[in-house]
Amino acid sequence: MTYLAKPKFHHPALPKNGLGFTHRDYEGSISTLCAGCGHDSISAAIISACFELNIEPHRLAKLSGIGCSSKTPDYFLGQSHGFNSVHGRMPSVLTGANLANKQLIYLGVSGDGDSASIGLGQFMHCVRRSVNMLYVTENNGVYGLTKGQFSATADRGSKSKAGGLNNDSALDLVGLALQIGATFVARSFSGDKKQLVPLLMAGLSHPGPAFIDVISPCVAFNNHPGSTKSFEFVRAHNEAVNRLDFMDTREPITVDYEPGTSTDVTLHDGSLLKLAKLHPEYDPHDRIAAMTYMQSRAAAGELVTGLIYLDPNPRDMHAILNTVDVPLNTLSEKELCPGSSALEKINAALR
């Protein structure tokens, strides 16, 4: 993988967060993606979200697969743990890492090729097992590294840069995430940082499987007329169901809303998610209604963005498996294997 080190020099007056870190402390190496790639905007949003959340870089683990999207973890959080897996296998690696050490914050970064094709089964099982993570897909509808073939999320009827039409129906990763049990589901647009950063902050703070599908136009192969993943198309067909402000209880934040236009959602760590309702009838706590709404708007040619679903009582894999409080990778051999006498007691209890 191409690597360009970023100079460590920065202006001494850069703002610092509650831990004394600047944005530069959350950056990685210099991006080698195409100039104007939407993925770089997502990386910048992740940097902002972690800065605002006062996350200690060493407490976060970033994992990815293969593709343009999976290169991006090299461009943010250079002081964090990282693992670049094989194509489509990131969810399994993340699941294993989470089982071994639940004290880390897990961020999985993938793409529409990595998650919707070769890694589709991995993605679905990782979500249905309720792994505590934020899973982000950087969705551009094409295979950018191999010159722009349609991916599984490309809409039927969309046109490639070479002029060919896609005749296959698209996989909707948001719809799949809703069906298989994700407890936090959202969609955003790489060009809308005001919406994306609060969603990332909320997803990173969510105690369960959080999924965000980010439409991220490929400027090289899928940003032309006829593409449904281009900057122009998304801006023209973007229907946001809510506007968000994430409030970390460690810092006082004031936001002005007209009475009756917003609702507060308290997260399990005490943080507050304030939703400004742009569609009064939309309820992000109703999974079935969310799926119905998504289908109806898709049929109308609209792209729904914002917080689509939030389970007020999520459970993660460790709660379901009833694992011990301490991380499994800290247990000694004696604790893991108490000896033959303990085994004899277990066998006797089952007779």
Predicted regions and their residues:
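Short internal beta-strands
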Residues: 62-63, 135-139, 307-310
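Short catalytic-loop micro-motif centered on adjacent basic/acidic residues
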Residues: 35, 108-110, 184-189
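Flexible, low-complexity linker and terminal segments
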Residues: 2-19, 220-351
